[in-house]
Amino acid sequence: MTLQFSWVASANSAETDFPLNNLPYGVFSTDGLEPRCGVAIGDMILDCRAAEEAGLIDLGADPIFDVPFWNEVMEAGHDTWTTLRARLTEILAKGSKDEVIAKDMLVPRAHVDLHMPFLVAEYTDFFASRQHAQNMGAILRGAASLPANWLNIPIGYNGRSSSIVVSGTGIHRPNGQTKAPDAEMPSFGPSKRLDIELEMGAIVGKGSDLGQPITVDQADEMIFGYVLLNDWSAR
């Protein structure tokens, strides 16, 4: 991929995670700003709420960044997502006529607190990696084998959406009942083992109508974006 250059100098560094080609969305606050939507660029964040209020971003008659989450953008659908992405790239590109105004809407990432970027309605964890499934088979059954239905239907687990938190949040060790090999009865207490799995999450943006399935061909237009997840499990 050819690097696109920005007037934000740090976005052109070979070391940055967020060049103009990669503009991740999030929600941030500072000591002087309440939580709001923003987009990272280099070591800065562009305040999307301020950009909309100044007229740099216009996605329709009603404001869309007047709330501290991305759900309204997600609900607007694929065409709006494409328009927004193109406009953000235009604003932040090297030589942009919007630099004079937009530079005052940048906030250093080092000075912000991050918040959940959207309200999570539902969380489904899929057993999608073949290698992971085989490794789990070796742990549980003593041989690297796939579950019988793995190649035919998706294996998924409904998780608790309320347990999803932003990076840096402390993890509470869960309590439950366990039974030691030499014990007659289970005992209640904190989990003695926790493991962590690095996972990729696909964010479903605009939902479907009740009872209407989403085809494979429609899937790309339903996915708003992707995130990295740490999946903690009590063992």
Placement of each model-derived feature along the sequence:
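Short, mixed charged/polar active-site loops
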Residues: L33-C37
